[in-house]
Amino acid sequence: MSNRVSTGKMAMAPQESVQPAVLYKLVLFALLMAVVPIGTYFSTLNYLWDGSTTFAAISAIAAANLILVGYVVVAFREDAASRTGPLPEKKTS
């Protein structure tokens, strides 16, 4: 006894389509998470902290956290906009 459909294939859940804007934002923030903390580390190591690796690492951690907060803010704004839907247009005579 298995959960097979009469065609012999396993039943699948309906697939939701991924919106291009969501995928674009995910790729953008993934690239930012890869580039910005490393760039922040090396730039602050040489120009701001004069070779102090501890403070440069703290700066990189702060940069990564700012990117994460930015992603969460963008996600919440997008979710709130999708819940309310488009505003109805007012007709002027």
UniProtKB/Swiss-Prot annotation:
Name of the protein described by the UniProt record: Vacuolar ATPase assembly integral membrane protein VMA21
Pfam families: VMA21
Motif extent (Prevents secretion from ER): 90-93
Record carries keyword Transmembrane: yes
Subcellular location: Endoplasmic reticulum membrane; Endoplasmic reticulum-Golgi intermediate compartment membrane; Cytoplasmic vesicle, COPII-coated vesicle membrane
Any one GO CC term of the record: ER to Golgi transport vesicle membrane
Function of the molecule: Required for the assembly of the V0 complex of the vacuolar ATPase (V-ATPase) in the endoplasmic reticulum.
Alphabetical GO biological process terms: vacuolar proton-transporting V-type ATPase complex assembly
Bilayer topology annotation: Multi-pass membrane protein
Alphabetized UniProt keyword annotations: Cytoplasmic vesicle, Endoplasmic reticulum, Membrane, Transmembrane, Transmembrane helix
Keyword Transmembrane: yes
InterPro entries cross-referenced by the UniProt entry: Vma21
Lumenal topological domain residue ranges: 43-54
HAMAP family assigned to the protein according to its UniProt record, in alphabetical order: VMA21
Record family assignment: Belongs to the VMA21 family.
Organism: Cryptococcus neoformans var. neoformans serotype D (strain JEC21 / ATCC MYA-565) (Filobasidiella neoformans)
Cytoplasmic side: 1-21, 76-93
TM region positions: 22-42, 55-75
Upper taxonomic lineage: Eukaryota, Fungi, Dikarya, Basidiomycota, Agaricomycotina
